[in-house]
């Protein structure tokens, strides 16, 4: 998700608990995952929440220019409207338009998908390189597992009970 847009999710926590390094933006639970297991054991890319905020406040983002100036991105975008994915070439026209021109009064590419494209592609190259080092990959996996305790349901329930619900733990004998 775009940095600053996602409150949190649990899917990536489940992946972490099972040893998968995270590939994603520094947003939502990814922030906590990186804090626990380290940036070196995950693959973070894209704009920061501060950069997104600055673009939202100051403007200056032109998805058309990003598409034209990012190697391969125009080909990816054109594949949405040239019949690559469906003989109904209009099937993805609204998606294309939302990213390049904006629709329904919204600005174009409001989630900065095109802006993050190059970082996403580079992150995948880093994943591919890291995966070739089996020992290094196993170390990343183990460090993700070993540092995933923060996401335990027991810890979460205790924290919610005391900080949100204002109830005490009941000892069962």
Give each language-model segment a name.
Residues 1-141, 145-150, 155, 159-173:
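Catalytic binding pocket for nucleotide-activated donors in carbohydrate/polymer assembly enzymes
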